[in-house]
């Protein structure tokens, strides 16, 4: 694919140089179209205009066609024209141009390319394959971008505020993982009655607040607790569930970005509101079914309160001091894992608040959700 596109661009430039850059019959010349970002209903594409050609560019932008199958085949390209779907963008001078195309269909493959038309005709750049992603009932799409992580007025371990950039978009669970979901996971993986795998306990069934038990043949959920968030799960048990789902626990930065409504950047103290009680259960005597409070700007529930949530990162109170700007993964080692969001038995905890527990901890106040990177 790369060889084809490089050859395509080279031939275009070679043709231009062969005919002469001042030739009145010269078409514009552009680089191959590249894909910068995509999601369920949009994509962002980019191309560079090298030459305007022998006359002014009168029409320009991007055009696209869809491909009905998601099977990847380098040779099965589609070449859109201005007779197909078009979104116009003024392209006048040699420069890098980026365009966002909205209104695409989820879970569909498109082929997109830039075009530029002058008096001599239309030049088309080499197309790029755009596989839009699915829309899920139980997951929320979080588009990649930048945000300011941490707090300038919080606790010491929330400082300093620093810019984080994600080079990937991701999906995150709309709700905290439930007892029913975790019970099904244990049974499908034929986990033993002690819920221990390779020496790591996944869930503490002996804790009286645990809503799962083993009846001698399989794991079962206690009556009325199916839709409550699963608790008494260790970090190992939470991460195992995430991996089975094709994902991971959220990194600390992914968690805070999603809680802050991603690119909407709501900037509220809690996940979707400046008032804790609108979006989260705090100072309560028991946990609650997910989705009973207001969601944040992305439609994610209970990132403030109900149960606190495991994150993937090791904890350090100095993690922010030398954190990488792009896709931070946290410290390489440690003794405790990050916990975020606060729990129903606590006073309100802001979305920048940080806590930590040993990964073997099976707390009645800690649950989790899943992140699937794109």
What are these regions (language model features)?
Residues 149-158, 311-324:
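Cytochrome P450 core scaffold surrounding the K-helix E-X-X-R motif
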Residues 151, 165-272, 316-320, 373-374:
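Active-site microenvironments of metalloenzymes and redox enzymes
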Residues 101-102, 230, 290, 300:
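Hydrophobic core positions of the immunoglobulin-like beta-sandwich fold
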């Amino acid at each position: 694919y790369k060889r084809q596109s490089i050859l395509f661009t080279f031939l275009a430039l070679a043709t231009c140089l062969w005919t002469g850059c001042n030739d009145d019959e010269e078409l514009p010349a552009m680089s191959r179209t590249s894909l910068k970002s995509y999601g369920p209903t949009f994509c962002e594409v980019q191309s560079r205009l090298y030459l305007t050609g022998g006359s002014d560019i009168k029409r320009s932008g991007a055009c696209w066609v869809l491909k009905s199958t998601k099977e990847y085949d380098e040779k099965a390209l589609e070449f859109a024209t201005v007779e197909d779907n078009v979104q116009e963008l003024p392209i006048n001078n040699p420069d890098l141009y980026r365009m966002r195309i909205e209104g695409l269909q989820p879970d569909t493959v498109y082929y997109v390319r830039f075009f530029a038309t002058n008096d001599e005709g239309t030049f088309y750049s080499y197309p790029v394959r755009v596989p839009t992603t699915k829309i899920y009932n139980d997951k929320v799409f979080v588009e990649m971008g930048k945000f300011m992580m941490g707090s300038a007025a919080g606790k010491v371990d929330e400082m300093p505020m620093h810019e984080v950039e994600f080079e990937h978009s991701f999906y995150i669970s709309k709700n905290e993982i439930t007892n029913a979901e975790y019970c099904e996971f244990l049974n499908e993986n034929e986990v033993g009655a002690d819920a221990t795998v390779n020496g790591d306990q996944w869930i503490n069934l002996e804790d009286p607040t645990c809503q799962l038990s083993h009846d001698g043949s399989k794991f079962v959920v206690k009556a009325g607790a199916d839709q409550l968030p699963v608790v008494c799960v260790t970090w190992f048990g939470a991460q195992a569930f995430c991996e089975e789902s094709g994902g991971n626990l959220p990194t600390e930065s992914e968690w805070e970005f999603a809680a802050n409504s991603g690119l909407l950047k709501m900037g509220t103290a809690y996940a979707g509101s400046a008032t804790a009680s609108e979006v989260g259960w705090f100072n309560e005597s028991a946990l609650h079914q997910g989705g009973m409070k207001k969601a944040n700007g992305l439609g994610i529930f209970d990132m403030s309160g109900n149960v606190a949530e495991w994150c993937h990162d090791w904890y350090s109170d100095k993690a922010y001091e030398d954190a990488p700007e792009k896709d931070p993964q946290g410290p390489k080692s440690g003794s405790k894992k990050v916990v975020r969001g606060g729990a129903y038995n606590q006073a309100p905890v802001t979305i920048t608040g940080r806590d930590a527990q040993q990964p073997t901890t099976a707390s009645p106040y800690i649950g989790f959700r899943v992140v699937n990177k794109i």
